[in-house]
Amino acid sequence: MSAEVALVYRVLPESVEVDIEKLKTSVINKLSPKYKVDRVEVEEIGFGIKALRFFIRMPESDEYSSDEVEELLRSVEGVGGYELEYFSRLSF
């Protein structure tokens, strides 16, 4: 069995007006089925602003990359910014 890579991205909406649940669904739909979204957390930042934290797994392979994940995130309407918080190789 090959190793996998775990990524955690924090995604911020463009504005307070962005529906956080719709943004969450849009990001999941954009990443799937190629990238596995294990979990999504909603983080209250303040002043009505919320961030999303996506826990993503992908095979350790040249066909998958964090650069591609970031391209996909940039292409989602409503995404104002993102940050890679965690990157680790998983092996079982």
From Swiss-Prot:
Keyword Glycoprotein: no
Single GO MF annotation: translation elongation factor activity
Keyword annotations: Elongation factor, Protein biosynthesis
Gene3D superfamilies listed in its UniProt record: 3.30.70.60
Function of the molecule: Promotes the exchange of GDP for GTP in EF-1-alpha/GDP, thus allowing the regeneration of EF-1-alpha/GTP that could then be used to form the ternary complex EF-1-alpha/GTP/AAtRNA.
HAMAP family linked to this entry: EF1_beta
Name of the featured protein: Elongation factor 1-beta
Source organism per UniProt: Pyrobaculum neutrophilum (strain DSM 2338 / JCM 9278 / NBRC 100436 / V24Sta) (Thermoproteus neutrophilus)
